[in-house]
Amino acid sequence: MVFERTLIDLIKGIRSHANDEEAFIATCLLECRKEATSQDADLKSEAILKLAYLEMLGVDISWASFQIVEVMSSSKILQKQKGYLAAVQSFKPDTDVLMLTTNLLKKDLMSSKVPEITLAIDGLSHFSTLGLARDLYRDVLILLNHSVPYVRKRTILLLYRLCLQYPEAISACIPKLRERLDDPDTSVVNAAVSVICELARRAPKNYLEFAPDLFHLLTTSSNNWMLIKLIKLFASLTPYEPRLVKKLIPSLTDIIENTHAMSLLYECINTIVSGNMLVGHSQCDKLASLCASKLRGFFEDTDQNLKYIALLCLRKLANTHPSLVSAQLDIILKCLVDTDTSIRLRALDLVNEIVNKENIRTIVKTLMLQLIVSSDESAVEDIRNSTATRIIEMTSKSTYMNIADFEWLLTVYVDLANIPGIDTGTLLNNQIIDLCVRVKALRPFSVDIFSQAILDPSYVSTTDCSVSEKRTDILPAIIWCLGEYAEFIEEYLDILDALTRPSFKKCSNLAHRLLLQAITKIFCQWCLEEEPTWGVEKFGLVKLWVEKIVSFIEQFLNFQDMEIQRRASEFYILFNQVSDIVNTSDTMEVLELQKKPPYIVQNTMYKLFFGEPLNPVAVKAQRKVMPDENLDLNCPINGVIEVPKELLENIIQSDDSLINFDTEVPSSGIDTFSKKQFNSLESVPVQRDLSSPFYLSSNQHTTTTNSEPENLNVETSMSDEAFNADKVTKVTKNKRRRKIFTSPSLQAMVVAQDEVPEGISLADIENKENPSNSNVYSLISLDPPLSTNQGSMGDIVLETKSPIRVEKKKSKKKKKKKEKTSGKE
């Protein structure tokens, strides 16, 4: 090239060669290599400047590190400036020539010219390493006494970088930084506060000695930016010095009441709610009320960021003063339906903390309406699922502590399942089952609404819907409850007919597993309920339904799911046993001998499914059972089985003889043992089978003819006394027989606690894990309700040893039945 390109020429050339930019840059790079080795200082510095520009385009210029150091050492400020600029951009911690810059940086730091000092400070802050920080931090400390405030400010900021690279320098820097807090220049003080604040984040306890000077700045400074830094610093110091709280509260209160800067106001409130300043003194309630009122003003602003940080502060405030946050429920509910997704999520987190018996209905209603409205919009699926999950969590919080009406809660769960576009099937199924297991008085109502759902043919036909229209599948919970609490079903045959519809083939595998078991339970309960009116007509119905159930179960024998196949095989054999008993040639003789349902249904199947009540078990119950001392869980049960060589040879020889036997024995030899003799031997039961309740004898209906009827009354617990009235009344043929219970609506709803192993208390392990909570007793107990604790309708009785109890309204239907029963008596 005839002439050298300047930086401006280089930029223009790159823009003009847009089509072949790489080739042009390669040409310029060759020129810069030649210029960088030139003896002309101006030409070399210009080449380094162009290389710095090319480095921003991604060109590697590490080969020019030594030439950059040469330009940095120039006595001319313009050339030195170009060298430092290239060094800042290209030097890395592993650059070899960094060791050559130590003396150069010392010389520039001690220069009498401010521009050279600032260049050295700026360069060192960018490419400092452990070695440079160790060798130069003492020289940098000298600059804290420089006469120019700008140099002092830049020096303080450089010290932060050096302390990070070389932590041993902190002990020497702290006294110097403390002196700069009294600097006459405000910018220097701001820099000192910033550095101290950043260093204190890593080890706050080491900076408690700064508290008097920092507090003086807090009370005298009018710089909002500095006040924010000071407040953040005190927030990190108060956990190590609780006495600072009393000193800070008046100053923070004064700032909150008088400032108009939202940023400063937020930092003050956040420091108070996060720094444990709302407990332990007489002004805590007044200060918390002031913070809550100021945070309310954040929601009136149009800035969405203020709403977001206000929700964060309110959630922290809810930990100490939930009642004050609950008073802001109206603005929180507005945030639940805000168009901003992040605000909705923060509002969800907040309402989960402040929910109580008074506001839970309002909160749940707002969330449900928000889900229904957003189902027609293109709402994010994760947000909808998160909202539905929060509804379930807040309603089941602390074992339904905030629930006064469990029937309302169950309808909420059912309505939640009917909202399209929500996928919380597993959680919702588990919650419905848990609710029915814990609250015994809720079971009749749950069976009633589940019966209505299962009788609707369209309820099952939702599997072919699109994702946006598909509803949460709670069929497993519905089927399980109908089978587990079949005694509350009113129309057994209608439910059995609904459960055996062909549309159930489209259900999930979990629903299929529970379906087979529920059908068996409902059939067994129906037979027991028909015992008082047993006759030819009922017997014929049983025969028809046994055939229908056998035909329905037969479809699942070859199912792909092994669990479904196993259950189908078990119940198929069980109903075949029932079919063999009821399908006799002389029906009248059977009716005269039994006068009741088959023994296998009345006794064996009943004990198989309804022998013991199903109670909730604590999650931590299993780990509280200590294993036996002689039990080694790490030892294999069988170990390594070694077969002796002689035994192995005998096994091989016996296998060979069996093969020869199969080929040599004539076919006539098989007939020597008649089929009749084989069946007679097969039918001989083992003695242990005769005493087993699960032994299904083929002639049980004839063996019990001369014996007295077996007492099938199951002993009930004290909590079941509400259902211990006479269950059966005489009815005519035209009048459907109904079971008469002592109305559960007249009794309190009891939420059952989790069961634990005998002799073990949940409080034992909790006291070990949480010693501070050793004196806290559970609000819910499994003890029977005391008559003296009967509350008014809808009240929850919270006592240390009494269960949660909810009075129910009297059911007109149950009341009429009770009057009829008393009249008959």
Swiss-Prot record:
HEAT repeats lie at residues 131-168, 169-205, 207-243, 244-281, 285-323, 324-360, 363-400, 469-513, 515-547, 548-584. Residues 807-819 have a biased composition (Basic residues). Residues 787-825 are annotated as: Disordered. InterPro entries: AP3_complex_dsu, ARM-like, ARM-type_fold, Clathrin/coatomer_adapt-like_N. Keywords: Cytoplasmic vesicle, Golgi apparatus, Membrane, Protein transport, Repeat, Transport. Belongs to the adaptor complexes large subunit family. This is AP-3 complex subunit delta. The lineage of its organism: Eukaryota, Fungi, Dikarya, Ascomycota, Taphrinomycotina.
